[in-house]
């Protein structure tokens, strides 16, 4: 089957399923695969949010309830579609191929790769999370800005160098985002679900799962005695991923302790 590396919207409208089935990321050919895209978007993101903070300094907050409700519901549903687009094919693939292949030589085309690609583009759309916070004049945590800035680079690098275990990272992130954006959607409706704290717990578990998959990748890649000798991807990309994931893990644990553990200790003292 001949792969396609570009999304021709005319062809896509005529045969969306066939287009997705034949899709495969190709460096410098697939739209926005060039390194200029993450450079412009990530540094443009920093310039925009800090410029907006200066602009909003002496202005009243902008509520944005209607837009924020749509934004969060859209990302919740998109995350669900991407999650299913990766997990269902990978589950079918895993039974005959085993653990080594799903970590080192997973599906590299079709719905899984198309879902990766949409996930990559969605990281730019998610910059709107920060824009909403700035327009509402809420303080920005380093964790928030770092997460949005570096995740685009993380996804781009893993797509470019085709890291075998990236499906674990992406599907885990999609699952967490289903829960997280549904929570934010509910809060925009005036409902405050009781399980807010557990979102951070899920995020911490996500990074532990991510690191486990990368450790498995490193283990298999050092063996050199499998079907194709080595895992798909590079050590440099995996090391970069390890650094980013560990930074997220540390920052989210720090946030959890500050936001929830200290609050519970204060409550105990007042009681």
Curated annotation (Swiss-Prot):
Keywords: Fatty acid biosynthesis, Fatty acid metabolism, Lipid biosynthesis, Lipid metabolism, Membrane, Transferase, Transmembrane, Transmembrane helix. GO terms for molecular function: fatty acid elongase activity. It is found in: Membrane. GO terms for biological process: fatty acid elongation, monounsaturated fatty acid; fatty acid elongation, polyunsaturated fatty acid; fatty acid elongation, saturated fatty acid; sphingolipid biosynthetic process; very long-chain fatty acid biosynthetic process. Its main location: membrane. It is a multi-pass membrane protein. GO terms for cellular component: endoplasmic reticulum; endoplasmic reticulum membrane. The keyword Lyase does not apply. Induction: Down-regulated by Pseudomonas aeruginosa, PAO1 strain and PA14 strain infection. It is an enzyme of class 2 (transferase). It catalyses: a very-long-chain acyl-CoA + malonyl-CoA + H(+) = a very-long-chain 3-oxoacyl-CoA + CO2 + CoA. Its EC number is 2.3.1.199. Signal peptide: none annotated. The chain crosses the membrane at residues 35-55, 68-88, 102-122, 139-159, 165-185, 198-220, 237-257. Fatty acid elongase with strict substrate specificity for monounsaturated fatty acids, in particular 16:1 (delta-9) to produce the unusual 18:1 (delta-11) fatty acid. Belongs to the ELO family. This is Fatty acid elongase A. It comes from Dictyostelium discoideum (Social amoeba). The gene is eloA.
